[in-house]
Regions:
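Short glycine/proline- and aromatic-enriched beta-strand/turn motifs that initiate or cap beta-hairpins
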Residues: 20-64
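Residues that define the transmembrane beta-barrel architecture of outer-membrane proteins
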Residues: 25-27, 44-48, 79-83, 116-120, ...
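Transmembrane beta-barrel strands of outer-membrane/channel proteins
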Residues: 31-37, 65-71, 102-106, 122, ...
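Membrane-embedded beta-strands of outer-membrane beta-barrel proteins
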Residues: 50-52, 85-89, 122, 166-168, ...
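Residue-level signature of outer-membrane beta-barrel architecture
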Residues: 54-58, 91-93, 126-128, 170-172, ...
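Repeated loop/turn-to-beta-strand initiation elements of outer-membrane beta-barrel proteins
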Residues: 59-65, 95-100, 132-136, 174-180, ...
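Outer-membrane pore/translocation modules
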Residues: 67, 75-163
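Outer-membrane beta-barrel "beta-signal"
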Residues: 206, 231-243
Length: 243
């Protein structure tokens, strides 16, 4: 966690300092709070999913930072207590369809039995579609992972590995009102064929104002090493602002 925070601070300082002497800088902030509640005579359950994102963009570089927290209970038992922080940057050279990226993230997850996990690495990406109302992007790269997991609920598992990280990102805006957006990952260990991670984040938003939307979101995570997965489907509000 300390490594991610330190990397955030260094890159943010470098990015904002260079902005004083180069092209204009644009900022974007987004916050989404979604959840679900179920109450019956036989039991109660609730889930709250909070996501915060911040983006700084220039002509030849973008910096993204984000954090999420998911908490859920069923009756008196905790089902989710999951947090994640991430930072990535993109560097564009010449043809903007192709760019290079770097990533660092840290997460903990009660539902996936992750005590601590750090990932860091980089790669390349290509924009197959890049328009004001539609984006389709595929990226691939290598990540180093250091993890502290819990196998079968009782067995500690501290290890590290290198992963190939493949991501497909899309965004489709219909009539400036409806927004379909998603990031979907497959991360396979290079040395262990049965060690893989699947992460899917997809949402449908309907704009009420330029800055406010109603959002339905679907999140799926699978960690094959711990044999755990979760599926979250919830709804709520998204607030966003460009400046």
């Amino acid at each position: 966690m300390k490594r991610v925070v330190l990397l955030w601070m260094v890159l943010l300082y470098a990015f904002t300092s260079s902005a004083q002497f180069s092209d204009s800088v644009h900022y974007y902030v987004k916050y989404a709070s979604t959840g679900s509640v179920n109450r019956t005579n036989d039991g109660n359950s609730f889930l709250l999913n909070n996501n915060l994102g911040f983006k700084i963009s220039k002509k030849k570089m973008t910096l993204n930072m984000g954090a999420s927290y998911v908490y859920g209970k069923q009756d008196h038992s905790i089902t989710n207590n999951d947090m994640s922080t991430a930072m990535d940057f993109n560097i564009y050279r010449g043809e903007k369809k192709v760019y290079f990226w770097g990533l660092a993230n840290y997460d903990k997850s009660y539902s996936l039995k992750i005590n601590n996990r750090f990932q860091g690495g980089g790669g390349a990406a290509y924009d197959f579609i890049k328009r004001s109302n539609a984006t389709l992007n595929v990226s691939d790269g290598i990540l180093f992972e250091n993890s502290d997991l819990m196998l079968h609920d009782t067995i500690p598992d501290v290890y590290h590995t290198f992963r190939n990280s493949l991501r497909v990102y899309y965004k489709w805006v219909i009539k400036d009102i409806i927004v379909l957006e998603g990031s979907n990952y497959v991360q396979n260990s290079i040395t262990h064929g049965n060690d893989y991670i699947i992460k899917c984040n997809n949402s449908l938003s309907v704009k009420l104002r330029s800055w406010l939307s109603i959002t339905a979101a679907m999140t799926y995570n699978k960690l094959n090493r711990t044999d755990r997965e979760n599926l979250l489907m919830n709804y709520g509000l998204t607030v966003e602002k460009f400046f």
